[in-house]
Amino acid sequence: ENVALTIGSQSAFFFLFNMLGGEHEDGTHQKILLPITPEYIGYSDVGLTTNLFYSYQPVIEKLDNHFFKYHIDFDKLTVRENTAAMCVSRPTNPTGNVLTDEEMLKLLAIAEQHDIPLIIDNAYGEPFPGIIFTETKPFWNNNTIFCMSLSKIGMPGTRTGIVIANDLIINSIRNMNAVINLATANFGPM
């Protein structure tokens, strides 16, 4: 009920962003909020409409030995009236920054408060063991959409995306899959 497979996580984001954001029948233009930048550049290619995203710059914490960590600037983060969903990658691509559990809990609370989904791109992260080296706790509730990818865990030929979400989102993805790609790829000889 809560899992759908796609032909890679990129197609999952194509489905999700265009299903939730963009032009709607009532004439509104819904947007996807990226709470922190830099963020995965590949998101910019999946929208069927222009101006699909808006985002915020991070707060930068300087660490020892010329290292730094950046965090979501919750003081500036605003969910607009036309926000359809929030999306973060954990860890972020391209920098590998891992949002803290505290940041994730705040994002979940904001998503629930505004009754919008929080899309979490876990292509490089939880729940697969040994992929990231920061202690994290996976989260899920009815407002959460997890996207994962088998290609990022050492199986690049599989092109299989995994979406975990509420049954309404999953049924919509299954319906889109039936039209666009009918079935995910099989492993075949490897």
Predicted regions mapped to residue ranges:
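Conserved core of the PLP fold type I
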Residues: E1-H114, I119-W140, I145
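Conserved core segment of the aminotransferase class I/II
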Residues: T28, L48, W140-M190
